[in-house]
Swiss-Prot record:
It is an enzyme of class 2 (transferase). This is Glucokinase. Keywords: ATP-binding, Cytoplasm, Glycolysis, Kinase, Nucleotide-binding, Transferase. It comes from Brucella melitensis biotype 1 (strain ATCC 23456 / CCUG 17765 / NCTC 10094 / 16M). GO terms for molecular function: ATP binding; D-glucose binding; glucokinase activity. Its EC number is 2.7.1.2.
Length: 343
C-alpha cells in the first residue's frame, strides 16, 4: 500500500523520534531509513525543566550523531508555535529547538496518533490478544490507552495509505449501569459536574475508583497510590483494591466496545500504555471481554472483534519510526505541525 509522495513530505536523516508523555519521555535516532534505531534510556519528565534541556543533556550530549529532523509525539493538542503538554510542565517550542539545538526540521504529532501508526508497524510478539478472531488486514482499528491520562485514536485505511484519526476521546462522559455502579458513582470526583473516561480510566482514575468503592462501603481507605492499589488488587490482599481492578477492567471493556462500534473496528481494538500491561491478568480474567461484547443488538459482531494489549514499551517510537522511514505508507497531515529552518 503506497501513496504518491513528494519531497516536501519526506524527512532528512538522521531523524530523532520522541514520545513525550505526562510522566516519561522516550527517544531514539534513525541514522537512515534502513538502520535499526539507536535507543536511549527512558527519561522522567520531572527531572528536566524543559524538553530542550532533556534532549541536549540526555540525547545530544550522549552521541556524536546530529539529527537533522525531529518527529515528536506529545500528550496534548498541537496548536501554534508553543505547545503545552497535558499532565506535564514542558512546553514544546519547535522554532527554538531549530535555533538552539541544530535541527533543520521539527514535526509534532499527537501521542496517540503515534500509537495508531504503531499498530500496523509492530510485530505480533509485541502484543497479547484477548478474545476475538484474527484482525481483518485493512479494516479500521482503534487505540485506547489508559496511563497518566486516557488517549484515544482511530486508524482508517484509504485506497493508498493508513490515516490516523487522533482526538480527545478520553474526555467523553462515562456513567453507571449496574446497581453497584450506582452505589459508587456518586463518590467519583467530577470535573464541572461530569465524570469523564479519564476520571476513572487512568492512573489517577484508578485511585478515584478505589476511593469511590471505599466510600460506598463506608470504610476508611488504606491505600494511597495507584501502584499500591494495583499491587493489592492483583495479590488479593485488599478486597476494595481487588474490586477496583475488576471494575476498571469492566469500564475499560465498555468504553473499548463503544469505540469499536463507533469505528466498526474489525481491524481490532488495541490497548496501549503502562496500565494495561501491568493489569494484564485482570484484563484476561473475564470481566473486560464480557463488558466489551455486551453490546446488544450487536453481540455477534463484538464477539469477532479482537482486542490486543500492546506489551512493547517503545510502541509510539515504532510508529514514528515507520512514518519517518516510509511516510508514503501513511496519510498524516503536517500542516501547522511542521517547522523548518529558514535558509
Amino acid at each position: 500500500m503506497q501513496a504518491i509522495i513528494d519531497a516536501e513530505q519526506s524527512f532528512k536523516f538522521p531523524v530523532l523520534v520522541g514520545d513525550i508523555g505526562g510522566t516519561n519521555a522516550r527517544f531514539s535516532i534513525l541514522v537512515d531509513s534502513n538502520a535499526e534505531p539507536k535507543e536511549f534510556p527512558v527519561l522522567q519528565t520531572a527531572d528536566y525543566a524543559t524538553i530542550d534541556e532533556a534532549i541536549q543533556h540526555a540525547i545530544l550530549d550522549q552521541t556524536a550523531i546530529q539529527p537533522r529532523s525531529v518527529i515528536l509525539a506529545v500528550a496534548g493538542p498541537v496548536d501554534g508555535d508553543e505547545i503545552d503538554l497535558t499532565n506535564c510542565d514542558w512546553v514544546v517550542r519547535p522554532k527554538k529547538m531549530i535555533a538552539d539545538l541544530g535541527f533543520e526540521d521539527v514535526t509534532v504529532l499527537n501521542d496517540f496518533e503515534a500509537q495508531a501508526l504503531a499498530v500496523v508497524s509492530l510485530e505480533g510478539h509485541h502484543m497479547e490478544q484477548i478474545g476475538g478472531k484474527p484482525e481483518e488486514a485493512v479494516a479500521t482499528r482503534v487505540v485506547l490507552g489508559p496511563g497518566t491520562g486516557l488517549g484515544v485514536a482511530g486508524l482508517v485505511c484509504t485506497r493508498h495509505a493508513w490515516v490516523p484519526v487522533p482526538g480527545e476521546g478520553g474526555h467523553i462522559d462515562i456513567g453507571p449501569r449496574t446497581e453497584r455502579d450506582y452505589q459508587i458513582f456518586p463518590h467519583i470526583e467530577r470535573i464541572e459536574g461530569r465524570v469523564t473516561g479519564e476520571q476513572i480510566l487512568s492512573g489517577r482514575g484508578l485511585r478515584n475508583l478505589y476511593l469511590g468503592i471505599c466510600a460506598a462501603d463506608k470504610i476508611t481507605p488504606t491505600l494511597e497510590t495507584p501502584v499500591d492499589i494495583t499491587s493489592a488488587g492483583l495479590d488479593g490482599s485488599n478486597p476494595q483494591a481487588a474490586e477496583t481492578l475488576d471494575l476498571f477492567a469492566t469500564y475499560l471493556g465498555r468504553l473499548a466496545g463503544d469505540l469499536a462500534l463507533i469505528f466498526m473496528a474489525h481491524g481490532g481494538v488495541y490497548l496501549s500504555g503502562g496500565i494495561p500491561v501491568r493489569i494484564l491478568s485482570a484484563l484476561k480474567a473475564g470481566s473486560f471481554r464480557a463488558a466489551f461484547e455486551d453490546k446488544a443488538p450487536n453481540k455477534a459482531i463484538m464477539r469477532d472483534i479482537p482486542v490486543r494489549v500492546i506489551t512493547y514499551q517503545l510502541a509510539a517510537l515504532t510508529g514514528l519510526s515507520a512514518f519517518a522511514r516510509t511516510p508514503s505508507r501513511f496519510e498524516v497531515s503536517t500542516e501547522g505541525r511542521r517547522w523548518r529552518m529558514r535558509r
